[in-house]
Amino acid sequence: MYYKSAIIVRFNMDSCIQKKQVWYKHLSPRQWKIFGAAWTGYLLDGFDFVLISLVLTEVQHEFGLTTIEAASLISAAFISRWFGGLAIGALSDKMGRRMAMVLSIVLFSLGTLACGLAPGYAVMFIARIVIGLGMAGEYGSSVTYVIESWPVHLRNKASGFLISGFSIGGGLAAQVYSIVVPLWGWRSLFFVGMLPILFAFYLRKNLPESDDWQKRQQENKPVRTMVDILYREKNKYINILLSCIAFACLYVCFSGVTANAALITVMALCCAAVFISFIYQGMGKRWPTGIMLMLVVMFCFLYGWPLQAFLPTWLKVDMQYSPETVALIFMLAGFGSAAGSCIGGFMGDWLGTRKAYVISLLIGQLVIIPVFLVDRDYVWLLGLLIFTQQVFGQGIGALVPKIISGYFNVEQRAAGLGFIYNVGSLGGACAPILGAVVASHTSLGTAMCSLAFILTFVVLVLIGFDMPSRVQRWIHPEAALEYDTVDGKPFYGARKKNVAEE
């Protein structure tokens, strides 16, 4: 007992010393190299993903698409993300984070090239599905790669800094759009977007593995991933069939092949049942935690993506700005989100993850309505408001990976994070279509504003009250985790450490 008490005291003393030192002095050149590679991968991921939003009106005009069909091209990438997160995440858990990152970059680069070559709507829709597979894999593998390599007390910063790369990639894409598209047309933008594949070869040759993953491998224990549980054990044939059903249902929901609300509702419920079944099989008695985490991510996408997906269209059509002005404001939004990601990382390590999340979202709520009240002549004021809203309303979402990671052990972290996050990201697939439906009854600006404002409050409740831990304790308290596996902070309802008990 005395020995364990000494360890706890020493840990607390070390934590106090760490907080007094400048944070970046705790990082080695190797850890910075790992971060730089993962951050660049995220930047390229963000660059490729937002290209369709920038040229959506041009694609819609050339292919003769309806607004719903055009919006489905944004949603298509989300249809496959759940499987990409699961499969590539499991590969990351078993074979290493680096290999998964390389495969992910190759997939979304090839999908981007296919978008530029697409002769029509169907081919572009399929190409966007391939982009979704790669994007999901990049997300899960890069996040776990950096979080597992950085010191425990800096892991909010690790998450926040990393996700900023996605937003900066979007802002960079906006600038490339303003230069390339007026000269060579919208297809040329996608050809530029295939360049990340060169970066994949650098990653394959020059990066080490994450610290936590290497330690886990040294234990020589068999790794039982979610892919093993779902597709290699007794229910494998049923789960393969369920996966096919999920893909088919998602296609019906998001391809625009039907506008029958009842049919779409039935398909959505079938998908929900499949994913809940997978969570139940993969997490056992901890399925309430998995479902609540999925809802957290879903509502994060629902409140944020209508604004991100339709911002270029709103600026071009409703505000009637030139391509150069659209690119400038979209760049400000991207860099606002990136700055917010970094600020969120500092806030998370300072105040705690959940408290930082709530405070940041409340500030963002104060700004969202004024964004849509500004007259079109006040371009810089509009840009400043959008920048501020993205800093506090969108940027704080960079802490979501850290939140989810804390509910999984190392051997299932990448697949768990990848699957939960990317199933929840279907909220991003719903968001553009939901925005288009609401906009059909009102203006696009009103639809974007109302959805963002209302749905943000749902996220405030889910994260602010730690609903994953609460619901877990209501249903299966014996399976509840006491402490975050990433930073050791207590979850809701955790017992205080009692040295005498230990």
Curated annotation (Swiss-Prot):
GO MF term set: carboxylic acid transmembrane transporter activity; sialic acid:proton symporter activity
- Which species is the source of this protein? Escherichia coli O6:H1 (strain CFT073 / ATCC 700928 / UPEC)
What's the protein's topology in the membrane?
Multi-pass membrane protein
The protein's UniProt keywords, in alphabetical order, are: Cell inner membrane, Cell membrane, Membrane, Sugar transport, Transmembrane, Transmembrane helix, Transport
Q: What is this protein called?
A: Sialic acid transporter NanT 2
Q: What does this protein do?
A: Catalyzes the proton-dependent transport of sialic acid.
Pfam families reported for this sequence: MFS_1
**Which Gene Ontology cellular component terms are annotated?**
plasma membrane
The encoding gene:
nanT2
This enzyme catalyses:
N-acetylneuraminate(in) + H(+)(in) = N-acetylneuraminate(out) + H(+)(out)
Q: Which family does it belong to?
A: Belongs to the major facilitator superfamily. Sialate:H(+) symporter (SHS) (TC 2.A.1.12) family.
Task: Please give the start and end residues of each transmembrane region.
Answer: 34-54, 71-91, 105-125, 129-149, 158-178, 179-199, 237-257, 259-279, 291-311, 326-346, 367-387, 391-411, 419-439, 445-465
- Location within or outside the cell: Cell inner membrane
